Amino acid sequence: DQVKIVL
């Protein structure tokens, strides 16, 4: 799985 969080 790939999780990408951009804030």
UniProtKB/Swiss-Prot annotation:
It comes from the Eukaryota. The keyword Disulfide bond does not apply. GO terms for biological process: neuropeptide signaling pathway; regulation of muscle contraction; sexual reproduction. Keywords: Neuropeptide, Secreted. Vitellogenic follicle, fully grown oocyte, egg and internal egg-capsule (at protein level). Not detected in previtellogenic follicles, external egg-capsule, central nervous system and hemolymph. One of its GO terms (cellular component) is extracellular region. Its main location: secreted. The keyword Cell membrane does not apply. It is found in: Secreted. Has myotropic activity targeting the genital tract. This is Ovarian jelly-peptide 1. It comes from Sepia officinalis (Common cuttlefish).
